Amino acid sequence: MNFQYLVKIVAGSYYNISSSILSKIINSVILAGLYYGFLTALALKTSYILLIRAMVSENQNHKAAATTGLILGQLGQFLSIYYAPLYIAFGRPYTLTVLTLIYFLVNLFGNNLDKNASSFGAYGNKIRTLEILCIFLNNLILQLLNTCIFPSSTLARVVNVYLFRCNNKMVFLISSFSAWLIGQILVLMCCKLVLGRGQNKNSIRALIKKYLVRNSMFFLVVNCLFGSSLFILTIQSLGRIPLPIPTQNLSEISRIEKREEERLKKSGVAKEGKSTEDEEDLSHEKDSFKKEPYSKLENEDEEIEKDIEQAIGTLLFDYKRWTRPFRYIKNNQFEQAVRNEMSQYFFGTQQSDGKSRICFTHPVNLSMFWKGISFLLRDKNYSNKLTRRWVQRNKKKLKSIKSDLVNRIRNLDNTIKIEFGTPRTRLCTCIHENETKQEYVPEEYDPLLAGCYRGRIKKEQAIFQKQENETLTNPLDTLIDVLENNTNTQLFKANPIGKQKISFEEELRKKVPRWSYKLITELEQISYYRNPPDDHDIRTRKAKSLVVFDPSKHPNMETMEDSGNIQNKSSDKTINPQNNLTNSKTRTSENDPDDNTTEKEPKDDKSYSIRYSHQSDFRHGLIKDSMRSLRRKIVITDLFKGNVHSPLFFERRKKKNLFSFSGLLKLKQLFITWSAQKEFWDLKDSKKKLKIKDKKQQETKERIEIAEAWDSFELTQVLRGVLLVIQSSLRKDILLPSLIIIKNLGRILLFQTSEWSHDFEELEKETHVPCTYNGVPLGEKEFPRNWLTEGIQIKILSPFCLKPWNDEKKPLPASENFCFLTIWGQETDHIFGRPRRKPSFFKPILTKLDTSLKKINVVQFFKEKRTPESNIVKEQKVDDLSDNILNEFQFSKREKLEAITNRTNLIKTKLETIAKEKKTVTRDLDKNLSKKSLKQIKFKLVSNLSLFQYFLKLFIQKIYTLFLRNILLISGLLKKILNGEKEQLIDQYCSKNEKIKKVHKKFNFILNRKSKLSTNFSNLSQAYVFYKISQEMANFSVCKLRSILNQQVKAVFVKPEIKESFARYGLIQIQKMDKKNLQLRTRQWKHWLRVNSQHHLSHILWSSFGAKKENWRKKIKRCNKFNKQSLQKGNSKGNSNLDDSKNRNKNNLILNKNKKDNFEKCYRYDVLSSKFIKFEKKKTSLFHRSRISLTRQKQILYHKNMSQNFLFALPKNMLVKNLMGKSERIHIPYIEKDLDRKYLSFENIQFSLKKKVNIESWIPLTSRGNRTKTYNYELLDELELMKFIDQIYKKEKEFLFPCIERNKQIRNSKSKYSFIDWMGLNQKLLKHPVTNLELWFFPEFVSLLNIYKLKPWVLQSQLLLSKLTFNKLSSQQQNQTTTKINTETKNQQKNRVENEENKETENQQNAETKNKQKSKTENEENKETENQQNDESEDDPQLAYIRSFMKKHLLFQLRGESIFKKSGFKNIQILCLLLRLMNQNEMLFSSIQREKLNLHIMPEIGIKDLTLEVLEEIGVPEFLKEKRVNFEPFPLYINKNGKFLIYQLLNMSLVHKIKYPTNNESRNQGVITTQKNNNVASHIPENILSSRRRRELRILMCLNKKKKKCKGTEATNKSFSYKKKCAKIWEEQKSTIEFFIWPNSRFEDLTCMNRYWFYTNNGSRFSMLRIVMYLPLKNY
């Protein structure tokens, strides 16, 4: 312990000694002098430039003069630090500025003169001596002026402080002077070394002498360069020195205020002197209008000159620079800023009389320094003589005070009680009436009585006291007086109270020191409504504006504004009774030369969005031309610095420690117990999350840096924008199409189907949208304003990605399926982000190859072969062990031990022998097999090489033949198509497909022994077994199956349903007992066939079906086992519309099973079912069906599975994907299935490569109707239709419901061609191109076409029939419409009867006259409606303006809340894009469907309900409080065309609309109940009537279903007479006759309706159009 104590003492003493020595060395005067001397010598100054120029020249005199001048100048400056007179002479700023400016002007002009000695002649020597003197003086004066490159006065201040502190001042001076000399010598030596190397090289020296020194221009250029560089550096150093010119005092009134007051006075006098006569005003206006252009030009020239003078003056000579503040603190918008005048000294606490008291002592820096040192001086007690004196004085004072108190207390008893008041001074206030009288201030507010109080006393004015007693006069009198006099001065007289208020406030106002001018920011300059200033004073952050909305591009806005202004003017004229006064005021203001408001400037109503840069903005908030603080300690290393700081504060930066002690402690605590493993993994996951966050932050930083790097220079944005545009055009037009072509050519070479159409469809989906620099999207073809200078981004929507084959995967949502384009043509997820990885083209190909190769079984060449010797050894081993175990019990213990040892030895020896045998066997096998395998491989290679040449030849020939075949086929097909051989092509194409699609399916589930089905055949159903047998058509004989099934024993186990199905095919003979059950089943078949007619099937199938009748009859006769008698009986017992087809096809029962023809497969079931009906022996009428109670107003049926708000509807159970690949086999749909499919020809839809349409997008896949309800209504009744639509609208409550209004221009349309080409009947009229060309070149369309024709799935829903106008009709209008309809119907029916009896020529003339009359009436109606609309807009122009703008755009206001973040800004981007687009409706619908626009944010107030009263009641701020976003939307509308309405009208009469409305019970249950038979034969009116009258009957039945009974006067037509006959025969089922007739009609009847409906008389192109003009439809 003692030893340690001694060591500590020694170490402490050593430390104290070393620290004392070091402190003495550091604080020594010599070292400080050396340090400051080197600093003064090595300070960079402008005078070194003159020294370098002298050193470069080879003249020794110049060098000597420059060095001596520099040393002497620095010596004088050095002495001025320690000598006060020199310091005052060279340190004052005003003297320096005066001397330097004069000196540098002389020096600049002197350097530019030609100084050749030859030009001066005899005076050359004298001039050379003057040059030497000038060099000497230049170097001396520059050193004295102290014009440093980095100007600072710290060195002089530090030297002054040290001289004040140190005691040995002479030692400090000598040491600093010696250090200064050493520093100067070092500087000169360095200059000589640097410049001497260049002179020593002979080559450089020779070149300088040869070319430069001899040339006189060289000296001039060098002198000019040095002079200009000197001038620039000195001005830079003089920038901080104040100018020696007296500036304006800050307390005085500014000149700007004076100018404003003078201008107001002049304008006021001018306005008073002007007359109010109209004639004089007009003459003055004409003269001023004539002089305007000349005066404007003169004023513009003067303003330009003034601006140039001001700019030059502010650059060179700004006299207010030193008076301006560094930072501008605004106090009020309407006043100048208050000056925070603060002296360099402040009040600090010091001790006086032993107490700390406030005193005016020292600067701020010293007080801060004292606070920093004070904590070091707490422990040390310093004795001071002053403190002892203060203590003694205080003690004496206390003694004197105590003695006085004691004496007073003693004298209290002796004194006499005398009351006297102590006089006190108080504050008084003067009264206005009598200044002599005064009033005391209340004691509460008197500072002399109650202490100081900073409250303000409010004096009661005499005016207010008088006004309380006076009665109120009529306020209209004062207004009339003001209007009659019409002077600005009397306006102030009307309010004397306010005038005296102002004077009273001026009395109490205190003058505060303010700046002499009001400084303005850039935003304030823009926000000036009138007379904006020329320039702003305070710097703002750098920003770039972007135009979001430009009203000039929308002419509707401008027209509405103009109309609104005109109407406002007219209304003002009517309202104002005194127009003369208002006109005089406006004219005087226009003629006033001082007011600048008369000049109408163009209104900039554009809405902008501001973009700020991410750069560090150090001049934000600074004042122009003000002094800047020198930041000497700042070091800028990077190109852009966000936070600039000095190197002294590097420790305060964020440090990333690799090893932290706190982290190690946490890990130690975690690993103490095993239960802490979960915490450890949680910590690991948190670290991963932190790493991911850091990566994201780094990426954002990189993106910001890249963006700012592009934005830093001007030309970079131009270059980047051009490159982006080039890359987008290259990508869309060249690169991607070429890749698609290469891919599809490769697929063709590899004998695979091409994917041209799919790839080009996806490429067309890719759209390039130009965006702003921040990524705000604009229109598709509209670039942002000034995009070359401000920057541009290109956004790619649904980018195209090339794939080896197109999979049916779900596409990405629209919010994720976009990217941005880079300069190099790559895709990025973010702006200026890293390029994203694309899925590789070859990766799926390689994976598919790998999977296919793995399936191949690799031949196992090397297999283990066991020798018989090893087996023998094992058998011996087993025998020996068994014998030993049996004999163990016979021996004693010793013998047992010996036996055990022997046995172990035997086992060891045997194991060793077995191991040796294995080694020998395996070695031999390896050698033999390796030799054999190598030989086999060599042999195979040699044989394959010889055959490889032949293989190549065969491969090339095969490709060649395939290409030739395809080319010949395409050319032949084109010729046939052009010649019109369509039917032959269809048959050929189908037969080829059938040959290719031969599939041989075998009984794999029975033959395979390893299958699980072979063990348990009970799991198999009989239907499945027979289905498999039916598929195997070629290898299985039907006769064997027939013999097996006819056996009584085996037929018992067969189910009855399967028996019936085989009986239909003729495989089983049906017994009598089974026929009863079969008859019930046949009724369902019979009902299905009667309900479904040939219109369910395509015309292609019917044509091919009719062509192959004879072949079918031959094949059916072979397999027919039924008796002809039963068939004849079935035919005689009933009559129907299908009798003809049944009699023709008596023997067509079963089709041939070997030939797999698609068309035969489709229709063999139809033939079978038709024959099966006749097989039945029951006496029932074939025309038996479920009766439906149809009323007058039931015409169109709504299906339960149809969605009722889409143009094209799809049932729930029918999908396009389910139909793909099922064209080979089509089954009969039972009644349980949905029978809502109908055929629609593909020729109606014109496909083209330019406009690809997604058919699946037309069809909704869901249905909203839960219950089956039949909504049937009359087409003629408009009011009932409106009620029906209102019911549907209330139920579904969909916000977006299309509003379709009636277009009156459709009646006047006299187009010859109709919109719909139904079944190709009017093909000659439309002059169709060959539509099948595209389908033959693109086989993908063929499969879709065939599938659609076999199983069509599209249905026109009821939306086409509805007239969706939701306008509320008043009761009067409804009555008027009903009366008009009734009158028109009567008149038109009369005309119809008369016209039928007349000739065709008379009919045409009548039609033409009626058309003309109708066109006139319709034009008049259109004019009336337009006039009504104009009247409404004129009555209320503001409402008209609001409504028109709301119809065009969706505008909304935002309130900055935390909840409204992402979704709101997405809506903003989409709405900005919609404002820019040309076709806004398409983009708007798509954005709503993709759920990008959030329409739930909109308010519930409609546009029609919006009035001025509503707006006033709501109020803007209250409405914004209720809802975060203020929408004023307009519901989406549909553009109505003539074609659309024609299509809507013609679809009312489509086949599937009224064809088969069955009972609701049968559709819900799926089973048809049997009814009693009516033994009444069914009559078909079509077969009775002639062709002409048959068509007339059909049209009249469609159009006149409202009337049930026929009157005698209206029954002249044969159709009506026939209708009466039908009523007598079959009175109960009138509606069913109409219902049955309509399905057999075709589009020929609809074309007649088209002619009859729109009054078109040109019927020459149709043979059947000879119908008389009938009554028009009442709705139209």
Swiss-Prot record:
One GO cellular-component annotation of the UniProt record comes to:
chloroplast inner membrane
Task: Please give, as recorded in its UniProt entry, the membrane topology of this protein.
Answer: Multi-pass membrane protein
Main location class: plastid
Could you tell me which cysteines form disulfide bridges? none
The subcellular location is:
Plastid, Chloroplast inner membrane
- Keywords of the record: Chloroplast, Coiled coil, Membrane, Plastid, Plastid inner membrane, Protein transport, Transmembrane, Transmembrane helix, Transport
Q: Which residues cross the membrane?
A: 24-44, 70-90, 93-113, 130-150, 170-190, 218-238
Start-end of Low complexity biased regions: 1372-1390
Q: Could you tell me where the Polar residues compositional bias lies?
A: 562-586, 1123-1138
Q: Which GO terms describe its biological process?
A: protein transport
Q: Does the keyword Transmembrane helix apply?
A: yes
**Which stretches are annotated as coiled coil?**
1384-1436
UniProt keyword Iron, yes or no: no
**Where are the stretches annotated Disordered?**
264-302, 546-610, 1123-1151, 1372-1436
Q: Where is the composition biased (Basic and acidic residues)?
A: 264-276, 283-298, 597-610, 1391-1402, 1409-1426
The record's listing under InterPro entries reads: TIC214 (IPR008896)
Subunit annotation: Part of the Tic complex.
Q: Which family does it belong to?
A: Belongs to the TIC214 family.
Please describe what this protein does: Involved in protein precursor import into chloroplasts. May be part of an intermediate translocation complex acting as a protein-conducting channel at the inner envelope.
Q: What's the protein called, per UniProt?
A: Protein TIC 214
Q: Which organism is it from?
A: Cuscuta obtusiflora (Peruvian dodder)
* Gene that specifies this protein: TIC214
